[in-house]
Structure formats: structure tokens, C-alpha cells
Amino acid sequence: MTRQGRSWAFMDEAARKEYWASLALRHCRGLGARSAARLARYFGSAYAAVQARSQWGEAGVNKAQAAELATGSWRVTAREEWDRARDISATIVLWTDPDYPTLLRSIIDAPLVFYCRGDLSLLQSPGFAVVGSRKATRHGRSVAEYMSRCLSACGIAIVSGMALGIDRVAHEAALARVGRSIGVLGTGIDVLYPPDNMAAFDAMERHGLLISEFAPGTVPHAGNFPIRNRIISGLSLGVLVVEAAQRSGSLITARLALEQNREVYAVPGPALDAH
């Protein structure tokens, strides 16, 4: 896959069939990412899984979900996503692509399709996640900057969530060296969030990589950010959590990383602080 990736205009018929099947599974009511990934693993692709829906029971997926797929109730929302991706000529990575990241593919609820902007070669780089507080101390920011800079210089892509605070420090420190950073969005690939993040988004698109599993045009929704955290950890060999609050997305990422058999490291805040 080249730097520009598999944009809509360059998808062949087989890829478009796989993409449509991936959307069918994504939008099939009651199926979920875990079952969709199980089907793709069992049958070899999303397209093969859709064609073999009468055999879903063999893959451990409820036959009622196959019946739901057969109703076609998913077609409206799938078509909306298809059209939006076509309209923006989105760069699309499919489960069947040889450049789909091996680490990400290994997680139990790996996305069947995601969208990208930037340097797709980073998908083949070893990744390490740096996440943490939006209101980090000077010490926390310094640690995140130092670790991100050093790891990036060693050829490791720094993975984070494009939020303010530690996320932004990690991305900027990685890009300042050799441009090895991946930002995982909780919005559509074409949606800027936070609104004041334009400079960071531009830098990531030019020198790093942005990815999102959500349909183009998806606006910020609180429930989507914890969902994307499994991809942050899934792309990474390990996760460094810097000064995370007791109830935070960073600790969700840490828990998911442990479930994915990743290494987890922590930099706590001051002893009497909540982080």
C-alpha cells in the first residue's frame, strides 16, 4: 500500500465488495464488533462471512443475528457511510488488506474497516501508546515528552488519542523527531475535534497518521471515545499511562491493554493528587 493508500477511487471490485460486506456486518443490529471480527476470522473475510450467513452458528455467532442480516435493515445506514466515504474519497483499510496491522488484527474486537489520513506506512511500525490526563502537571508532561521523543527516535510509532494534555504532548514530541505518531479519533476521519486542534491535525496528516473506525461525518459523542480506546491499545506493544484520573478514558485504555496482553506502565501524579 502506498502513502496515499487505498482511496475510494482506486478500490477494485473485490475491495468494494469486501467494504460493503464490512459495512453490512458493522450496521447489522445486535451483531457487535466482537462477533463481526469472529466471523471474519472464521470465514476469512467479511464478504465470505456475509455469503455464508447460514453457517454462522459454526463460528459461534447466534443464528438470529444472521436472520437480522438477511432482513436488510442495515442497508440505509450502511449506504450512508458508503456514500460519505465515496464523497470524500476516503482512504480505507480493510480486514483483508495485507497492510492491516498484525497487532490490531489480534484483538478480539478488531474493526473490519477503518479510515486513514496521512502516512499509512506507520501501520507497519511497532507502536507504543502514551495516554493520560488532560490536566497533567509539568512533571507529567515532561515525562510524556521525554518518553515519546526517545521511543520515536528508536523507530516506534507513538499512539494516542488526539486529546488535549498528555495526548497532544505525546504526538508533538514524536513528530518533532522523525514523524512517527498515530492519532486514533473518536469522530469521523473528516471531523475536527477538539475544535482548536487544527494545527495538530494538520501536522499529523502531513507527518504522521490519523485513523478512525467511525463513519466519515461522525460528530463527537461521549460513548465513542471509550470504544476507540481498544484501537489505541490494540495498535501498541504497550501503554504508558501518565497521571490518569480515577475515572478516565486513560484507565479504560490501560484495562483494555491488559485484556489484550499488552504491557502497561504508569507515571502517577503527586501522592495526594487524584491522578
State what each model feature region is.
Residues T2-R16, R86, I92-H275:
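Glycine-biased, small-residue-rich flexible motifs in mid-sequence functional cores and linkers
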Residues T2-P98, A266:
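Short, small/acidic-rich helices and loops at N termini and domain boundaries
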